[in-house]
Amino acid sequence: MKIKPDDKWRWFYDAEHDRMMLDLADGMLFRSRYARKMLTPDAFTESGFCVDDAALYFTFEEKCRQSPLSSDQRAELVLNALVAARFLKPLMPKSWHFSAHRQPMQPAVGEMVAVTLADSGEQARLLVVENGDNAALCLLAQPALTLAGKGMVLGDAIKVMNDRLQPHQQEKTTRYARAV
């Protein structure tokens, strides 16, 4: 799916679906992963897609381009990242699920990072949505992950302490752009 930010896009909360939505202005609607209980009060007032949203969109889109996700999955991840950055309530870190590293990482917004599950040693890929001195708000940047018996899916949010994060190693596969 190829989408491009537009000043006609608008944010709104859909009570029927209990989700934050983004009207993409060309007959397409994006339904986020986030329900009312996860959203800040300003999510319930309709608002336009601003220049800051567009800049953040391009940051996330550029960083996700090299991921092994399909184009539809990348679009879903990027749009959920925008919702999380703008409207998600603060989360408490859930770092006990992941192994600590000696050198805490200071990730940048939009950076792909990896975590190692403490119970299995499995690696998971996350997208940093918001960075802080000690922890980062991240979204799951892979189709699924089981964390302590609970399933997470692409775009689910989790806050992780920086000492659990490590740089994500890109897969060494050749990817070709597709001409349309």
Curated annotation (Swiss-Prot):
It holds the Pfam family ZapC_N. Its main location: cytoplasm. GO terms for biological process: division septum assembly; FtsZ-dependent cytokinesis. The keyword Cell cycle applies. GO terms for cellular component: cytoplasm. Disulfide bonds: none annotated. Keywords: Cell cycle, Cell division, Cytoplasm, Septation. It comes from the Bacteria. The keyword Membrane does not apply. It is found in: Cytoplasm. Interacts directly with FtsZ. Belongs to the ZapC family. Contributes to the efficiency of the cell division process by stabilizing the polymeric form of the cell division protein FtsZ. Acts by promoting interactions between FtsZ protofilaments and suppressing the GTPase activity of FtsZ. This is Cell division protein ZapC. It comes from Pantoea ananatis (strain LMG 20103). The gene is zapC.
